[in-house]
UniProtKB/Swiss-Prot annotation:
This is Large ribosomal subunit protein bL34. GO terms for molecular function: structural constituent of ribosome. The gene is rpmH. Gene3D superfamilies: 1.10.287.3980. Signal peptide: none annotated. One of its GO terms (cellular component) is ribosome. Belongs to the bacterial ribosomal protein bL34 family.
Amino acid sequence: MAKGKRTFQPNNRRRARVHGFRLRMRTRAGRAIVSGRRRKGRRALSA
């Protein structure tokens, strides 16, 4: 019986486009996410 493929197929360009910093800065909610992560002291603010 054939199994399906793994669902996570890493791709850096897609990762940046979907979760990246520029995308976060585009919307008010995204900026809120980044500022919250800054406040918390996260090492990485976004992908």
